[in-house]
């Protein structure tokens, strides 16, 4: 198992007496692609800035390779940062932009040339050394910003919503490129985003944050398929969340009937919440379904139809490849492996 390169221990941060981070604890492994995911104001960027040395924690420790670095300035940390605003120098060539940090460190010129060429190859911009920044597209400028950060050979790269300014097509392409770069280089990437698709596409581990606290951490599959609470379930993709009762291990009561499930470990007859993803509800003939409802709306989304099906006083969001006309009475089946049980937390 890979060892930790960074440990965040009980990090608390407040601004003007208002808590922004509430005793965050997080271990980040070597060569891991970790994403801090959450809505605006959740504390993800503050966490990143504390790691980079741009903000001080009010309390707590940041450990890098076994040593506390709270008082180490940014330029002495083996950590580099790429921001959404690329901060490239328009009066310099691409070569000069990438080489800027190496020149400051007085690295020998032959080494600078070798390292810059290696970075240009990595970001698929070989032969661009003498071009101006203004001649590049947004996606190419972002690649240069990444190359400039990586040429210093950091052990950790911090990325603060670096793809936010790109259009959808470029963003999708850069997601694949970033993951490829990270694997080739074998260094740790810590990525901040509010975009669930980005997090699910690129990450080895996702840390979901809200209101200065970690709500859940795990693999993309764990986060999507086994959300820990209603916030995570709603934030990571669309969800149907309903109240229910866990009758016993592998048996749950919701929507007026009993369903087999794969969860266990709850108290008998414990109040719980059930999560069912829209794509996990199967539309069938009304006399063949576990539940029955009326199609209230239907929208074609390209790869599926998105429907609202009203069952008694409850509305279900359903994604199906089968078209059902509005007003049609349909059956709905939900299989045990598609029912996810969460502890019920009072508001």
UniProtKB/Swiss-Prot annotation:
GO molecular function annotations of the record: ABC-type putrescine transporter activity; ATP binding; ATP hydrolysis activity
SUPFAM superfamilies referenced in this protein's UniProt entry, alphabetically: MOP-like, P-loop containing nucleoside triphosphate hydrolases
Membrane topology according to the record: Peripheral membrane protein
Binding site for ATP: 38-45
Family that this chain belongs to: Belongs to the ABC transporter superfamily. Spermidine/putrescine importer (TC 3.A.1.11.1) family.
Catalytic activity annotation: ATP + H2O + polyamine-[polyamine-binding protein]Side 1 = ADP + phosphate + polyamineSide 2 + [polyamine-binding protein]Side 1
Gene name per UniProt: potA
Protein task: Part of the ABC transporter complex PotABCD involved in spermidine/putrescine import. Responsible for energy coupling to the transport system.
PROSITE patterns in UniProt: ABC_TRANSPORTER_1 (PS00211), ABC_TRANSPORTER_2 (PS50893), POTA (PS51305)
PANTHER family per the UniProt record, alphabetical: SPERMIDINE/PUTRESCINE IMPORT ATP-BINDING PROTEIN POTA, SPERMIDINE_PUTRESCINE IMPORT ATP-BINDING PROTEIN POTA
Domain ABC transporter: 6-236
Keyword Repressor part of the UniProt annotation: no
Listed SMART domains: AAA (SM00382)
Keywords: ATP-binding, Cell membrane, Membrane, Nucleotide-binding, Translocase, Transport
Protein name (record): Spermidine/putrescine import ATP-binding protein PotA
Compartments, as annotated in UniProt: Cell membrane
Top-level taxon of the source organism: Bacteria
EC number(s) per entry: 7.6.2.11
Subunit structure: The complex is composed of two ATP-binding proteins (PotA), two transmembrane proteins (PotB and PotC) and a solute-binding protein (PotD).
GO cellular component: ATP-binding cassette (ABC) transporter complex
Transmembrane residue ranges: none
Main EC class the enzyme belongs to: translocase
Keyword Protease: no
């Amino acid at each position: 198992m890979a060892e930790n390169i960074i440990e965040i221990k009980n990090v608390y941060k407040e601004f003007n007496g208002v808590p922004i981070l509430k005793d965050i604890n997080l271990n980040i492994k070597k060569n891991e692609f970790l994403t801090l995911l959450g809505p605006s104001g959740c504390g993800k960027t503050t966490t990143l800035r504390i790691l980079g040395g741009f903000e001080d924690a009010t309390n707590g420790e940041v450990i890098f390779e076994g040593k506390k670095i709270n008082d180490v300035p940014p330029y002495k940390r083996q950590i580099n940062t790429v921001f959404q605003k690329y901060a490239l120098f328009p009066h310099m060539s691409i070569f000069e932009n990438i080489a800027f940090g190496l020149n400051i460190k007085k690295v020998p010129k032959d080494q600078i040339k070798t390292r810059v060429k290696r970075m240009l190859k990595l970001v698929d911009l070989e032969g661009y050394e003498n071009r101006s920044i203004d001649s590049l597209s947004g996606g190419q400028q972002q690649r240069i910003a990444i190359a400039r950060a990586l040429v210093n050979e950091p052990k950790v790269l911090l990325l603060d919503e670096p793809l936010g300014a790109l259009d959808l097509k470029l963003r999708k392409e850069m997601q694949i490129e970033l993951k490829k770069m990270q694997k080739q280089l074998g260094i740790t990437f810590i990525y901040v985003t509010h975009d669930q698709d980005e997090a699910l596409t690129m990450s080895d581990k996702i840390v979901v944050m809200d209101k200065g606290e970690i709500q859940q951490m795990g693999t993309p599959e764990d986060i999507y398929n086994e959300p820990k609470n209603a916030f995570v379930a709603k934030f990571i993709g669309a969800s149907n969340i309903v109240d229910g009762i866990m009758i016993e291990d592998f048996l749950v009561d919701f929507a007026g009937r009993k369903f087999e499930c794969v969860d266990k470990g709850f108290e008998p007859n414990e109040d719980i919440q059930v999560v069912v993803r829209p794509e996990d509800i199967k539309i069938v003939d009304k006399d063949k379904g576990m539940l029955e409802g009326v199609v209230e709306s239907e929208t074609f989304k390209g790869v599926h139809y998105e429907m609202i099906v009203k069952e008694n006083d409850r509305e279900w969001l359903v994604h199906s490849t089968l078209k059902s006309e509005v007003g049609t009475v349909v059956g709905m089946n939900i299989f045990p492996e598609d029912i996810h049980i969460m502890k019920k937390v009072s508001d």
